[in-house]
Amino acid sequence: MATVMTAPGLSWQPPDWRDASAYEFTRGLPRGHWAWEFLRLNPGYAGDWAWFNASWKALEAEYGSPPHRDFHRWKSDPRAYRVLTSDLEDSGDEDAVLIECWMGSKWGFYKFPLDPALDAPTIGEQLAWRPVTCAARELASSVVERMETAPGGSPEKLVLEFDLSLPLREQLDSARNLAVARQARLRQSGKIVLRTVQFCAPGWMACLRALDARAAGASVEEASVALLSVEALRTDSYAALLKQADALLNGGYRAILLLPDR
């Protein structure tokens, strides 16, 4: 039997990436649990949680736990706080927040920080994700040029021009109608497929296996043979699969929360 290694920094044993059936638990997962599956594999989160857990236990050892906790002394202890800045790095003593709030702000959730070893936390009770917005953004002219001149273009992207010297209401209404019509045409022609949890799930499952394979020290050859044969996987490159997996691991898990179930 093959030896399954535990990834450095993890306090729990991930599934054996070689065994596709070990990932059957992901079938039918709602978006909130998919996001958790990628967050819990993030080494940064594992490290932050280990620090948080040790700090919390040290505070409890000194000040007690509810209902006998000395809240006044707890909240007067600098160890109960961490500085929150735009880049989430410590810088001075201003804008300090409670360490449980620091964890939630950094990683995108409300509620008490969860041990990455926890399977299937109850969404809304144990884990509540912070709202994620999908905002339009201005593209640099060089990016627009590459998109428009690339072979075949980029059908899922639409670049619109607005005359900012004129009223925007009519222009925005027109832009919405144009985008809706183009989306419908592209879907009908099969050039794009709307991303849903159901549509993306097979690829996400492969991404979880790829992350577990890398953490277990699997060779590129071994992992490629096992993972690139996954039906409905939209890449034939193990490097590309790992790139997708890393994107989900490093913050992309929050974008999952924007997708409809089906």
Question: What is each model feature region?
Answer:
Residues 1, 184-262:
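K/R-rich mixed-charge low-complexity regions
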Residues 2-182:
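DNA-contacting interfaces and partner/effector-binding or oligomerization modules
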